[in-house]
C-alpha cells in the first residue's frame, strides 16, 4: 500500500472523520448532491451515480434527508451523510473514526449494522471505537494502541477476555468480567464469553452440569 500513489489510495481507501462536519464539501446544497460529489469527481456516468447514490441512501436510511441542505443537519444526521459519502465510493478499505459519537443508541445500532453489512460484502473495515460491547459484537480483531505503539493485537475473543487490557484503562465487556469471575471461582468454562449470547450459552452449559460446573473445592 505504501507504494501506491495518493490518487490510487483515494479510490481504494475511504476515511470517515470523527467530526462529520469536517467532511462536508461545503459546496453542495442538498444531501443527495453531497453524497454524489465524490463520484462526480471520478467522472462516473450520470446513470451510475444515480444508481449508487439511491442504493446508499436507502442502506443508511436517509431518504428523508435527500433534499435537505447538508449544513442544516443535526450531528447524527451529518454523521450518516458522511458515512454515505464514503460508502458510495465503494472503497476496498474503510477507515471509520468514532462513527457513533453523535448518535443515540438506536442510531448507533443502525450504523454498526451497516458496518457489518460492509464486512459481509468483503470490505476491510478499520474502526476506531471505544464502545467495547459493540466491538465485542462486531469486530474480528482488536488492536490496542498506547502512546502511538501497538500494545496488543489479537482476535476479538482473545483480546477482550485479556485482563491486561485493564492495565491500559480499557474496561472489559461485562460478560467477559462475569466469565473471568466464574473461572476464578473454579468453574470450568470452555471459553470466556464476551457477548450476551455467549454468556447465555456458558451459563446454560453450567446449569446442565448441575449449576456448579466442575468447580473445584
Tell me the role of every PLM-derived stretch.
Residues 90:
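Conserved catalytic motifs of ABC-family nucleotide-binding domains
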Residues 36, 40, 47-64:
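Conserved ABC ATPase "signature" region
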Residues 161, 165-217:
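ABC ATPase nucleotide-binding domains
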Residues 129-130:
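H-loop/switch region of ABC-family ATPase nucleotide-binding domains
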Residues 147-148:
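Conserved ABC ATPase "signature" C-loop
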Residues 94-97:
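Catalytic Walker B motif of ABC-type/P-loop ATPase nucleotide-binding domains
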